[in-house]
């Protein structure tokens, strides 16, 4: 059987507030309108996960502006949540938007990998869906990918599909990721995420075509280096025959399977048991993984390597 991986995960959201206003977003709240997660509540939630097979704690944060007086407190909360997760025996992965060099270097201490969606490299989208989203500037996000490479951090990135990009722009975005990977070799997976309409978005953008998604997967597999794993979120491909077509085109990972998809809250995951059975009936073996791929275990600091070895042994 062909192995398909997934990450048994749970999401902590330090805050939903975000200074970006992407017109397709179903996650954000207005700055200062959201009550931040406290460390004590986070610890209680994580302690309640004992015995449920959860490995990855995805720390997924809305963005506080880099010049805000609250940026330091925001970052310290994100860092401390990673430390709490570590101390409770979990494996943190953080996605908190573009970070400074010092911020990303500190998060490396308490995370097994970091992530940031490239989304699309087209600056044209800054006049449409990203017109009120300063941190979606493509060069800023590409620079973040390079910075993670310079610092030797295993990294997840990806494309958001169906937000107004052209076929050529998709190809250019994949080429940009490939170029960064050829220089640094730190990108472990690329998510190909089809836009899926939700109740909170302000733009009338329709769902991305499953047939188009398969075409993009085929293109990505041709462009990206072989060591990069292609990932799709299975809850955003609800028709199982479409999911099988994605696997046939080159997808080998289904990402974090979580109780609630915080970015797409209208789309729920099947149970792992259901998904595993369906895949097995079609020749695929669903297997859990860590938020860092085995190739990159040696990139981690000694403390993180030790925590992995305890679990593996």
Swiss-Prot record:
Q: Which GO terms describe its molecular function?
A: 4 iron, 4 sulfur cluster binding; 7,8-didemethyl-8-hydroxy-5-deazariboflavin synthase activity; iron ion binding; transferase activity, transferring alkyl or aryl (other than methyl) groups
SUPFAM superfamilies hit by this protein: Radical SAM enzymes (SSF102114)
Q: Which UniProt keywords apply?
A: 4Fe-4S, Iron, Iron-sulfur, Lyase, Metal-binding, S-adenosyl-L-methionine
InterPro entries reported in the protein's UniProt record: Aldolase_TIM, CofG_family, Elp3/MiaA/NifB-like_rSAM, F420, rSAM
Cited SMART domains: Elp3
Q: Which residues bind [4Fe-4S] cluster?
A: 18, 22, 25
List residues of the Radical SAM core domain.
4-235
* Pfam families tied to this protein: Radical_SAM (PF04055)
Provide the reaction this enzyme catalyses: 5-amino-5-(4-hydroxybenzyl)-6-(D-ribitylimino)-5,6-dihydrouracil + S-adenosyl-L-methionine = 7,8-didemethyl-8-hydroxy-5-deazariboflavin + 5'-deoxyadenosine + L-methionine + NH4(+) + H(+)
Provide the cofactor list for this protein.
Answer: [4Fe-4S] cluster
Under the heading CDD domains, the entry gives: Radical_SAM (cd01335)
What Enzyme Commission number(s) apply to this enzyme?
4.3.1.32
What's the record's note on cofactor binding? Binds 1 [4Fe-4S] cluster. The cluster is coordinated with 3 cysteines and an exchangeable S-adenosyl-L-methionine.
For the protein in the UniProt heading, the enzyme class is lyase
Give the signal peptide, or none: none
UniProt pathway annotation: Cofactor biosynthesis; coenzyme F0 biosynthesis
What quaternary arrangement does the UniProt entry report? Consists of two subunits, CofG and CofH.
Q: Which NCBIfam families match?
A: F420_cofG, PRK06245.1
Q: What does this protein do?
A: Catalyzes the radical-mediated synthesis of 7,8-didemethyl-8-hydroxy-5-deazariboflavin from 5-amino-5-(4-hydroxybenzyl)-6-(D-ribitylimino)-5,6-dihydrouracil.
State the family named in the UniProt similarity comment for this chain: Belongs to the radical SAM superfamily. CofG family.
The name this protein goes by in its record = 7,8-didemethyl-8-hydroxy-5-deazariboflavin synthase
The gene from which this protein is expressed is: cofG
